[in-house]
């Protein structure tokens, strides 16, 4: 890490999924300076990482959408009751653009350390790129932000390809002529 100046914000949000995007919008509306630190190269959280074939929400799409703005509700039309991953990702990108939130998101900036100093009532946050100081640190990382990699005896000796839903490759996968095992 370069020896740079500590950047100060009223609030730091870790994660640019649905919760992080909402927090950034609300904090800005309160007049607070805030930034999202996002380890991925785009927003979406779960809906960015989980792009495996057939990924979709398990509740009605309308319930998944933000309820804080009636105009937003009226301008977005879900194509099906239980939307697939690409449409959900398109929706959250629409929200970020509509409310001009992208300038408050630092992409490819994974938090490596967050320390609260009680005597100062401040958080000190470090990433591979920057150091930050803030009064409020909101962890909007969600319960699916860390892949659950199985640990089987002999797995380290397996020479084939291992794919997980939580880290599914962006490019299309071809399983023709391959032996495939599905676990879980």
Give, region by region, the residue ranges found by the protein language model:
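N-terminal Rossmann-like FAD-binding beta1-loop-alpha1 element of flavoenzymes
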Residues: 6-36
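Conserved Rossmann-like nucleotide-cofactor binding loop
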Residues: 19, 41-42
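Extreme N-terminal leader/targeting segments of oxidoreductases
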Residues: 1-11, 29-30, 58, 90, ...
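A short beta-to-alpha transition loop/helix N-cap that caps and shapes the active-site region
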Residues: 43-48, 146
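Nucleotide donor/acceptor-binding cores
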Residues: 9, 32, 135, 177-179
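Glycine-rich dinucleotide-binding loop and its adjacent helix/turn
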Residues: 71-78, 84-88, 141-184
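Feature captures the FAD/FMN-dependent oxidoreductase FAD-binding
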Residues: 78-145
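Glycine-rich active-site loop/strand segments that organize a redox cofactor
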Residues: 33, 48-91
């Amino acid at each position: 890490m370069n020896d740079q100046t500590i950047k100060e914000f009223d609030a730091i949000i870790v994660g640019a999924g649905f919760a992080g995007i909402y927090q950034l919008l609300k904090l800005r509306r309160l007049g607070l300076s805030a930034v999202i630190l996002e380890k991925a190269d785009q927003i979406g959280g779960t809906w960015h990482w989980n792009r495996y074939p057939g990924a979709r929400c398990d509740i009605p799409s309308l319930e998944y959408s933000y309820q804080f703005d009636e105009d937003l509700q009226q301008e977005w039309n879900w194509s099906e009751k239980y939307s697939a991953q690409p449409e959900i990702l398109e929706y959250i990108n629409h929200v970020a653009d509509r409310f001009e939130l992208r300038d408050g998101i630092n992409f490819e900036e994974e938090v490596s350390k967050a320390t609260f100093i009680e005597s100062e009532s401040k958080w000190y946050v470090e990433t591979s790129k920057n150091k930050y100081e803030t009064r409020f640190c909101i962890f909007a990382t969600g319960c699916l932000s860390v892949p659950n990699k199985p640990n089987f005896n002999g797995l380290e000796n397996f020479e084939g390809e291992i794919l997980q839903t939580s880290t599914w490759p962006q490019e299309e996968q071809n399983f023709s002529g391959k032996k495939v095992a599905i676990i879980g």
